[in-house]
A protein has these predicted regions:
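Solvent-exposed loop/turn segments at secondary-structure junctions
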Residues: 99-101, 133-135, 153-154, 180, ...
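Short beta-alpha junctions and helix-cap segments that line functional grooves
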Residues: 182-184, 247-251, 271-275, 305-306
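Autoinhibitory N-terminal propeptides
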Residues: 1-69, 79-114, 118
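Hydrolase catalytic cores
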Residues: 171-174, 195, 199-201, 274, ...
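Short acidic, glycine-rich surface-loop motifs adjacent to enzyme active sites
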Residues: 215-241, 264
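Catalytic-core regions built around general acid/base machinery
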Residues: 246-261
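Subtilisin-like serine protease catalytic core
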Residues: 116-129, 134-149, 157-209, 225-228, ...
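Extracellular S/T/G-rich loop segment that most often corresponds to the catalytic His/Ser-adjacent loop
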Residues: 131, 279-369, 407
């Protein structure tokens, strides 16, 4: 009888243990990238000086710390991943993946115009948009400038700008006041304050670490600017369990600090189990998209085909809002999608769960204006309990249904 030595079993077990500490997407890159450096997010509680020495010894470098998830943004040679993972104090190595944007009648459908007329406009509440930046559009800056802060993770610029257009559009969905259209194209919370954090480049893409750096800035400055809400119209196909997913961990940290977080369900429908990360967060208010057919009559509405769906294992989205051909603020002449159409120099249309998400953020601002003491979980529950069902679409397609701000305010 041939006996396999104990040390062989020990080595196999060790190899399995090490591989389980590395994102599978990174393991797939090892074969063809070899010694090339790749951006990773490294979970470790080692002191900076010790971690820096270990990483540099193996040819890597630390970019910056991500205390929001107890991790580091690091560049590592592909062929040294296993060596790094084997070190004591290294918990997990995740790919620093590329995230992208998730690319009126709408405000009438969710009844925000009615509550605006009653005096609820989001005044005094700040919404932070982590996106491509913001153009200083008249709908944000007149009659007074409501862009209270701008932070640029990508290029380090100080003054507000948007070299893509997506961030400007979503900010208008939530907080545009319609100044350039005499109130015609107005967002849900037209007097809310705006914080714009640029985490995506001119192509609408960015690394997870940059988005996490933006989240960290929001967390560090939430009291200074009264940031009560974060709107995230971004996403990627989930590749890790939620407890290891860097973006989900970031969202959950914001939520634990009392911030309302609205996140796009993603545009990968209509199949089930297509919710994008970080919309997979159990805490976040995940928002799907409705096609309102450009009418204020809800009876002809349908859940958009592209809107991400949940599954029996993930009860998402939480709610839905209009997300097809939404007219909102334009960033000069900067185009950001093939589906967009210029209405005039100041406005353009866009389609996606990206557009639905800030509407939910605006709704949260109206509730917080009426009662600033509401907790984020209370806001989530109010929006869900007052939502209107869209046709016979199921739970994993529409969640609780279309947000109804008029009814939601009655519960506050």
């Amino acid at each position: 009888m041939n006996l396999i030595p104990i040390f062989v079993f020990s080595k196999i077990a060790k190899d399995i243990f090490i591989k389980n500490k590395i994102d599978k997407r990174l393991l797939n890159k090892v074969a063809y990238l070899r010694s090339e450096c790749v951006p990773v997010i490294l979970y470790s509680r080692l002191p900076y000086s010790i971690l820096k020495a270990k990483i540099e010894k193996l040819g890597g470098s630390i970019k910056f710390e991500l205390p929001i998830i107890n991790a580091w943004s690091v560049n590592l040679p592909c062929n040294k991943l296993a060596k790094i993972a084997s070190l004591s104090g290294i918990h997990f190595i995740a790919e620093d993946s590329t995230i992208q944007v998730q690319l009126n009648i709408a405000t009438q459908e969710i009844n925000s115009r009615k509550v605006n007329d009653l005096g609820y406009t989001g005044k005094g509440v700040t919404i932070a948009f982590l996106d491509t930046g913001i153009y200083p559009h008249p709908d944000f800056t007149k009659p007074k400038n409501r862009i209270v802060a701008f932070y640029d993770v990508v290029n380090g610029k100080k003054q507000p700008y948007d070299d893509n257009g997506h961030g400007t559009h979503v900010a208008g969905d939530a907080a545009g006041n319609g100044y350039a259209s005499n109130g015609k194209y107005k967002g849900v919370a037209p007097e809310a304050n705006i914080v714009a954090v640029k985490v995506l480049d001119a192509y609408g893409k960015g690394l997870s670490s940059d988005i996490l750096a933006g989240m960290q800035w929001v967390l560090d400055n939430k009291d200074k600017y009264n940031i009560r809400i974060v709107s995230l119209s971004i996403g990627e196909t989930p590749s890790l369990p939620t407890f290891l997913d860097p973006l989900v961990r970031g969202v959950d940290t914001l939520w634990k600090h009392g911030i309302v977080v609205t996140v796009a369900a993603g545009n990968s429908g209509p199949n089930y189990n297509t919710i994008t990360s970080p919309g997979t967060s159990r805490n976040a208010i995940t928002v799907g998209a409705v096609d309102d057919k450009r009418t204020s009559d809800i009876s002809d509405d349908e859940i958009a085909q592209f809107s991400g769906r949940g599954s029996p294992y993930l009860y998402k989205p939480d709610i839905v809002a209009p997300g097809v051909k939404i007219i909102s603020t334009a960033s000069g002449n900067v185009p950001f999608g093939a589906d967009e159409i210029m209405v005039n120099k100041a406005y353009r249309t866009a389609t996606g769960t990206s557009m639905a998400t800030p509407m939910a953020a605006g709704a949260a601002a109206l509730l917080l204006e009426k009662n600033p003491n509401l907790a984020n979980i209370q806001i989530k529950n109010i929006l869900k309990s007052t939502a209107i069902k869209i046709g016979d679409a199921g739970l994993w397609t529409q969640g609780s249904g279309m947000i109804n701000i008029e009814e939601a305010l009655k519960k506050v």
